[in-house]
């Protein structure tokens, strides 16, 4: 098995961006553990972790967007603009659903989940459309992204309905699930 075979600059951007997103999830998870543990003062480490999550997340989006944009010029698959429009439409549908139907305060996590899902699906689409991923790998990764996004949305909707301890654990589920999906994505891309 050969890793990183014929990697071009756009492939490295997508790989590095996903790696940074994995680090972002881990920093965010560390912040969550430190800041929201029941009966805990939080401590000063929380500020470091959330800052690191923000920086790695923004850098990841920039890198992945560059790689996706470059590859989309040659992609014969689903155009990325349809994925982005679908993600934006879903976000704007879920804003009132979240507030009106579920009576849940809208927080930045709703936007973060949509950005993550659209970014990952866009990467899968261009990697499939350029022939880097076969249909099996593309469908598997897209399904994992979909499952992780739906799990995150369910946890998001339930968060304020749970007691302190349950909501603490509930908040870790999307971060852990997304980190797992990104680790799988990195492994699949490395050997493709």
Identify the function of each model-found stretch.
Residues 1-77:
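N-terminal topogenic module of multi-pass integral membrane proteins
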Residues 64-72, 97-104, 157-163:
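C-terminal ends of transmembrane helices
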Residues 89-147:
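Membrane-proximal helix-loop-helix units in multi-pass membrane proteins
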Residues 171-183:
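Small-residue-rich transmembrane alpha-helices that serve as helix-helix interface/gating elements
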Residues 129-139, 151-170:
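Membrane-helix boundary connector in multi-pass membrane proteins
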Residues 42-47, 106-112, 137-139, 166-173:
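Non-cytosolic membrane-interface motifs at loop->transmembrane helix junctions
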Residues 50-56, 82-86, 140-147:
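Structural signature of hydrophobic alpha-helical transmembrane segments
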Residues 183-192:
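Juxtamembrane boundary at the C-terminal end of a transmembrane helix
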């Amino acid at each position: 098995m050969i890793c990183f075979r014929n990697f071009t600059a756009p492939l490295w951007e997508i790989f590095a961006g996903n790696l940074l997103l994995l680090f972002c999830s881990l920093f965010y998870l560390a912040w969550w553990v430190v800041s929201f543990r029941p009966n805990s003062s939080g401590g000063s480490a929380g500020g470091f972790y959330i800052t690191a999550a923000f920086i790695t997340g923004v850098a990841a989006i920039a890198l992945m967007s560059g790689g996706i944009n470059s590859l989309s010029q040659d992609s014969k698959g689903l155009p990325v603009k349809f994925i982005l429009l679908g993600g934006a439409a879903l976000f704007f549908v879920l804003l009132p659903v979240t507030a009106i139907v579920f009576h849940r305060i809208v927080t930045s996590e709703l936007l973060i989940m949509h950005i993550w899902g659209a970014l990952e699906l866009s990467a899968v689409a261009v990697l499939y459309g350029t022939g880097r991923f076969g249909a099996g790998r593309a469908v598997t990764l897209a399904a994992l992204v979909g499952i992780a996004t739906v799990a995150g949305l369910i946890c998001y909707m339930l968060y304020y309905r749970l007691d302190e301890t349950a909501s603490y654990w509930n908040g870790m589920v999307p971060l852990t699930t997304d980190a797992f999906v990104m680790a799988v994505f990195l492994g699949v891309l490395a050997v493709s």
